[in-house]
């Protein structure tokens, strides 16, 4: 994971979300601190789910899902200086998340994904378009994003894309290709 993050940074990536659903809090914190040390301040680091570990590791923000702490509680923990992102999977969730003080909202899965054990229903490009109509906040599209479909997702209204599987096995090369495709 650390080597991949270093390659992503070398490929021009400026924001990485650290997501570890299986590791113990101690392991996650150790990895997160090493990630921060290794990348310095050249890359914004977002902690998945855990506001406490975000603060302890010196990350730039927290991303929460629908089953995590409510955004208002997370904001009380992290303060106003750090970023807060919220995952949404349908128009109702997006409308509620839009009323929070999150800096950005994620919408997805846009396409079928293998990165989650039990993913929510696919929203498709139409889901991204609808989300764009419902919020003025930056939208991050997630779920099944590849170099082949990233441009269409941005054209549908996403400000950014979140990618896991299509960055491997060559993170630097893949990141550079994403930047070339997205301009």
Where are these regions (language model features)?
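A short, flexible beta-alpha/helix-coil linker loop
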Residues: 111-113
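Conserved N-terminal beta1-alpha1 strand-loop-helix module at the mouth
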Residues: 1-71, 75-104, 120-126, 130-139, ...
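Glycine/threonine-rich flexible loop motifs
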Residues: 115-117
């Amino acid at each position: 994971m650390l080597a991949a993050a270093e390659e992503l940074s070398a490929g021009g990536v400026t924001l990485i979300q650290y997501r570890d659903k299986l590791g113990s809090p101690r392991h996650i914190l150790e990895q997160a601190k090493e990630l921060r040390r290794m990348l310095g301040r050249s890359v914004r680091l977002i902690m998945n789910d855990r506001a406490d570990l975000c603060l302890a590791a010196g990350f730039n923000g927290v991303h929460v899902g629908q089953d995590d702490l409510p955004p208002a509680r997370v904001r009380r923990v992290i303060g106003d200086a750090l970023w807060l992102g919220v995952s949404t999977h349908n128009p109702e969730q997006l409308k509620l998340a839009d009323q929070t003080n999150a800096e950005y909202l994620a919408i997805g899965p846009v396409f079928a994904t293998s990165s989650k054990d039990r993913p929510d229903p696919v929203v498709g490009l139409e889901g991204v378009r609808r989300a764009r109509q419902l919020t003025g906040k930056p939208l991050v599209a997630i779920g099944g994003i590849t170099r082949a479909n990233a441009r269409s997702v941005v054209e549908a209204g996403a400000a950014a894309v979140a990618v896991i599987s299509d960055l491997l096995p060559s993170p630097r090369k893949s990141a550079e290709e994403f930047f070339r495709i997205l301009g």
